[in-house]
């Protein structure tokens, strides 16, 4: 089997069962695919290139929350505004796990605020 075939065959999306006491449930939080993460980053980045947390937290909760019994997604995009009315602690609990499982780091959030040419020149200076 080629390396390509091995990579494409592996299940590489991490999961974690998260207890959300504010909601009285456990949610399976899954990491996002590359496409999902890119979509959310594009959607949550304001015109100035800064992360809009009011936008990104519910988007991450929607994208990463699954029913541990059925495997179905818990929320749909139309739930975004109603999620913003829920406990900030609960949203933070789920979103932070979703971000960690999806490779969001402080460094990746900081990169969103940089001009792409600035980032490219920094990357070149690492060589």
Where are the language model's segments positioned?
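Short, surface-exposed, charged amphipathic helix/loop patches that serve as local interaction elements
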Residues: 14, 22-127
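Catalytic micro-motifs at enzyme active sites that drive phosphoryl/nucleotidyl and oxygen chemistry
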Residues: 17
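Extended acidic low-complexity intrinsically disordered regions
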Residues: 1-14, 126
């Amino acid at each position: 089997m080629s390396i390509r075939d091995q990579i494409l065959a592996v299940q590489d999306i991490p999961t974690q069962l998260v207890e959300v006491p504010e909601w009285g449930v456990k949610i399976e939080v899954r990491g996002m695919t590359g496409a999902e993460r890119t979509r959310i980053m594009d959607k949550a980045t304001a015109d100035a290139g800064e992360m809009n947390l009011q936008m990104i937290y519910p988007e991450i909760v929607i994208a990463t929350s699954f029913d541990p019994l059925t495997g179905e997604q818990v929320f749909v995009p139309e739930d975004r505004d109603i999620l913003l009315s829920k406990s900030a602690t609960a949203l933070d609990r789920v979103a932070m796990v979703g971000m960690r499982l999806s490779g969001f780091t402080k460094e990746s959030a900081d990169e969103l605020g940089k001009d792409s040419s600035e980032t490219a020149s920094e990357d070149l200076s690492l060589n």
